[in-house]
Every structure is written in C-alpha cells, then in structure tokens.
Amino acid sequence: MAADIGIDLGTASILVYVKGKGVILKEPSVVAFDRDSNEVKAIGEEARLMLGRTPGNIVAIRPLRQGVISDYTVTEKMIKYFVQKALGRRTFKKPRISICVPSGVTEVERKAVEEATYAAGAREVNLIEEPVAAAIGAGIDISKPCGNMIVDIGGGTADIAVISLGGTVVNSSIKIAGDDFDEAIVRYMRKKHN
C-alpha cells in the first residue's frame, strides 16, 4: 500500500507527516557532502552538527534559500532521504506527496520543487501554499465563507494570507524571516556587548 506524505520543506527545517501516523520527522534542512566526489556524507541533524566543523573538502549547506531551492540536486537528495527515513521500509508503490511552497514563489520555482519531489520518488505531487497548510494544521475550517488571516514566519520567508472558501483571497510573501531575526539579534548583541 502506498503512503500519503506531507512535507513542509522549509529553509531552516523540514517536517514530514505520514497519514495515520502524524508528524514523524522534524530535522534541519542541511546536507553535508564531499566537494571532490559530490558524495552525500550526512543529512538533517547529523549534517547540522557539521556546520563550521568540517575539513575543507566536506561542505555542509542549506539547499534552500529564502524558501526556494538554491541547489536542485542536493534538495532532491534531501527529500529522497527524508521520505525513505519516514517510511522506514521499502514500499512497492511510490508515495503520494503533498509539499508546501511559499505563497509568493514563481512558476519556475514551483516547477523546481515539483520536479525535485518526483525525482525523489513520488508517484504524485501536490503543491500547497504554506499559509493554507498552516491554516489546516491549526485546525481552521478554511471552507467557511469568512476570512482568516494567516501569518506563517519560517526561516527564509514570512507568508501572509487571507483564506476563505477553501482558497487564498490575497497573499504576500516577504523574504525577511527567522534567519534574519537571528542575524539581527546577533548583530545587536555584538554591538551592545562587544
């Protein structure tokens, strides 16, 4: 039997939901690989622990920047790894995967996420805008004829949307989010406390 999987592919972290089991993985969106051979050395938490601590030929990177794919091949490998880790076994049927994208991404960026997910082994891919997924995850009935404002602040983007009657009425995505907040705090602390 094929699995239904939901993936929140974020700049800072990735969450994997499996139907009937709930959220079973939450790990950093980091991949460590050998620059010389392009061999993946670690993914997720193990790779995050390598950030800034690797020899010259091992590079630990975050393959998404501001909510979009910055390294297609590495993102594909990361998605494949987390899908296999979530399923924990070989399946005869490829899974159906619903994956989140920021509300302001271009058609090219949407296509890149879709293609990377298919290449990672999906049978069917559904792209869902992050504010819609956040509303559903918060238990909001998005089918009602009243507006719900959703503000989803991730690591790379902040998505703001008004959702009503099952769709997005208006939305905006800005590329200022959690990573920028962290950097601003670090700059302030350095300036204030040397």
Where are these regions (language model features)?
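Nucleotide/phosphate-binding catalytic cleft detector across ATP-hydrolyzing
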Residues: M1-I153, A161-N194
